[in-house]
């Protein structure tokens, strides 16, 4: 883009002219180059080393610190900016600078080629009116499937609020208007299910939140073998009701209609996968496996199975190399059957990044997933994580914010945004966002972990220690928590305690997978470089997904001067935009 606009200013990149309204603002070459670099990457931390390489390369004999400080001072003066209360340029202590004003460029779009929709719809949890509480999986599973189907049907014209925010209102007595205001949703779909033997009764109604006006309602009484047709009919009727002028026709993704048992297993898998953290992961894996065993051509179930297999690697329920290979097989099968399944493309993006280090292919897969279903929050979240790992922090936060708009109460999405702030060096913001997440769920272990890491980098080691000790009360034998605690103990000078924690983590290897990547972190804290690199080499052989964060993670800074570090990063295929920063 030739013209970059921000606030009252615009910079013509070709003519190198900065203007405020009709007036030309005089700016010397170096401040102008710094401004251009910041405008290309709004929200990103531009490090002092990066500025040195860009403006004062090797062989330039200047007092770098004095020259950079003078250039920043002149730039702030030209913009009328205040270093203490910045409207444009924020100083990130010990790192560099960040441009904090929005810059409306295509590159800063939250999603590849899609703007946020103006209208949003929330599918509220369907009530289970059956006497049998074990049928809860059916009402919750139906809710989740409607969320999944309406995304592609509405094709980005109407944003579909995600499952975490939807499930928050399960059993709520709040009025439609209040729920709509809380989630910024204009429409609500609500209903109930009642199962009696081989018959099922489903009632659904579409409501305009602001006026609480019912736009459409329908009651279905079918045999359980017709669940699929009911679900497809409900999704289609919603999309064609008052929303029909906004929504182009699209094909819903449904299961094979001659496999009702597979669909029932699929719903049970969705129900388990919706549970917090990794609580239901193993059960979800079992049900999705049963679904695709009964119906090998069930593409949506194969995609869901692939997603859970990736999660098995991320949560270390299984050796990552094994789990990711299984996920690739499932995702490939899903796309061969139906290339329009958004989730299968999103998982394929994860696998390109985790297994192959092919970041361009990963970005293309995420883009396709979001194109097929712009309400796919998991795809947006994964895309944001990839951007953060490439040091494209402004774009990463924009993608995460788009996902958060669709599912504001999803802890995973909020955590990705917080982690992005942490690796960008914005520790105080990361700390504040972690505390907000812990207000939502005080037992969210990931938030305690990121909070501890940010506190440690901010020089508040005792507080970091307290957070990890608190996290351990929720899961006393988690090897990652033990490794992170060992790292903090080591940094604080408690060597014997750190070594004891490492030994405790390693003792778990008899019964479960203990990720060497996190043991490497503990050894780094102790200054044990040989042990750290040995563990990182093993993490590479295991294809640990966390290894992609190596060059982003500030706690590994002590290893970066070691001659073994750069070859390892090259082997992992961490993106060039990160390497050398």
Give the positions of each predicted feature.
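Acidic, proline/glycine-rich low-complexity intrinsically disordered segments
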Residues: 2-7, 12-13, 17-26, 30-62, ...
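The N-cap/first-turn positions of alpha helices
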Residues: 31-34, 75, 516
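Residue cluster at the C-terminal edge of the helix-turn-helix DNA-binding motif
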Residues: 37, 77-85
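Juxtacatalytic C-terminal regulatory tail of Ser/Thr protein kinases
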Residues: 84, 101-113
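Minor-groove-contacting beta-hairpin "wing" of winged helix-turn-helix DNA-binding domains
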Residues: 88-100
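C-terminal non-catalytic interaction modules
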Residues: 534-581
């Amino acid at each position: 883009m030739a013209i970059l606009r921000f606030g009252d200013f615009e910079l013509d990149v070709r003519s190198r002219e900065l203007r405020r309204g009709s007036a030309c603002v005089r700016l010397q070459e170096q401040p102008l180059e710094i401004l251009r670099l910041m405008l290309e990457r709004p929200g990103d931390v531009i490090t002092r080393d990066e500025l040195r390489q860009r403006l004062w390369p090797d062989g330039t004999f200047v007092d770098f610190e004095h020259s950079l400080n003078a250039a920043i001072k002149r730039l702030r003066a030209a913009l009328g900016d205040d270093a203490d209360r910045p409207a444009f340029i924020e100083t990130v202590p010990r790192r560099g600078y960040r441009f904090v004003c929005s810059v409306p460029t295509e590159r800063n779009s939250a999603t590849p080629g899609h703007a946020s929709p103006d209208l949003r719809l929330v599918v509220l949890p369907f009530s289970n009116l059956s006497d049998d509480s074990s049928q809860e999986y059916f009402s919750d599973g139906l809710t989740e499937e409607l969320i999944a189907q309406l995304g592609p049907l509405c094709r980005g014209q109407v944003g579909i609020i995600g499952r975490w925010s939807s499930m928050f209102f399960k059993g709520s007595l709040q009025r439609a208007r209040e729920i709509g205001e809380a989630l910024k949703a204009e429409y609500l779909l609500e209903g109930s299910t009642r199962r009696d033997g081989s018959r099922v009764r489903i009632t659904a109604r579409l409501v305009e939140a602001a006026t609480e006006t019912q736009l459409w309602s329908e009651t279905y009484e079918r045999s359980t073998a017709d669940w699929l047709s009911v679900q497809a009919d409900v999704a289609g009727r919603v999309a064609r009701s008052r929303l029909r002028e906004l929504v182009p026709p699209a094909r819903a993704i449904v299961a094979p209609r001659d496999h009702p048992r597979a669909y029932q297993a699929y719903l049970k898998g969705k129900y388990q996968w919706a549970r917090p953290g990794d609580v239901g992961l193993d059960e979800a894996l079992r049900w999705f496996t049963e679904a695709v065993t009964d119906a090998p051509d069930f593409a949506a179930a194969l995609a869901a199975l692939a997603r859970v297999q990736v999660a098995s690697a991320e949560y270390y329920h299984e050796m990552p190399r094994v789990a990711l290979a299984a996920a690739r097989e499932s995702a490939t099968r899903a796309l061969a059957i139906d290339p329009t399944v958004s989730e299968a493309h999103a998982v394929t993006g994860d696998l390109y990044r985790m297994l192959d280090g092919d970041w361009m292919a990963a970005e293309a897969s995420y883009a396709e997933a979001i194109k097929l279903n712009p309400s796919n929050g998991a795809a947006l979240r994964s895309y944001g994580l990839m951007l953060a790992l490439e040091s494209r922090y402004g774009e990463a936060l924009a993608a995460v914010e788009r996902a958060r708009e669709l599912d504001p109460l999803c802890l995973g999405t909020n955590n990705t945004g917080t982690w992005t702030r942490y690796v960008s060096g914005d520790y105080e913001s990361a700390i504040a966002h972690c505390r907000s997440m812990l207000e939502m769920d005080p037992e969210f272990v990931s938030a305690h972990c990121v909070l501890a890491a940010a506190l440690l980098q901010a020089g508040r080691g005792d507080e970091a220690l307290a957070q990890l000790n608190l996290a351990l009360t929720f899961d006393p034998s988690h090897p990652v928590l033990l490794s992170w605690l060992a790292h903090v103990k080591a940094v604080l000078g408690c060597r014997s305690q750190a070594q004891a924690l490492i030994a405790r983590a390693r003792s778990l290897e008899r019964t479960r997978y203990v990720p060497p990547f996190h043991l490497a972190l503990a050894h780094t804290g102790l200054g044990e470089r040989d042990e750290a690199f040995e563990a990182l080499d093993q993490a590479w052989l295991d294809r640990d997904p966390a290894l992609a964060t190596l060059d982003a993670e500030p706690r590994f800074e002590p290893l970066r001067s070691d001659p073994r570090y750069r070859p390892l990063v090259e082997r992992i295929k961490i993106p060039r935009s990160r390497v050398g920063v």
